[in-house]
Amino acid sequence: MSNVPAELKYSKEHEWLRKEAEGTYTVGITEHAQELLGDMVFVDLPEVGATVEAGADCAVAESVKAASDIYAPISGEIVAVNEELNDSPELVNSDPYTDGWIFKIKASDEAQVAALLDAAAYEALLEDE
């Protein structure tokens, strides 16, 4: 079973969300998602300053197996991207919940966070797949 940190929120599309300061959240893909994709070769990062809607594709993870869209779990403005992934996309595989984060988003509606899955609900989703 994949590692599912209890302090994070999750989307049904296998993104995770970690609360930072002042309405900002860090986003990445889950361990389960990176296991399905295999070794990352490139991550197409979103543009800082871009406004995204919850559920909209805003980045792409390319692996040896496939290219997969990464979706914004909440609406808001992209305030940072993980530039380390330009040279080391494998961080998404080796450390998906810390060094392999993909972008940071300033929430336009923090109520959307409550609609995301907690760790137990995400684990249940994985069991059903």
Swiss-Prot record:
| Gene3D superfamilies according to UniProt | 2.40.50.100
Q: Which GO terms describe its cellular component?
A: cytosol; glycine cleavage complex
Q: Which SUPFAM superfamilies match?
A: Single hybrid motif
All copies of the Lipoyl-binding domain together span: 24-106
Q: How is the cofactor bound?
A: Binds 1 lipoyl cofactor covalently.
- What is an example of a Pfam family matching this protein? GCV_H
Q: Which controlled-vocabulary keywords does the entry list?
A: Lipoyl
Q: Which cofactor does it need?
A: (R)-lipoate
The similarity comment for this entry is: Belongs to the GcvH family.
The entry describes its oligomerization and partners as: The glycine cleavage system is composed of four proteins: P, T, L and H.
Provide the protein name. Glycine cleavage system H protein
Organism, by scientific name, is Klebsiella pneumoniae subsp. pneumoniae (strain ATCC 700721 / MGH 78578)
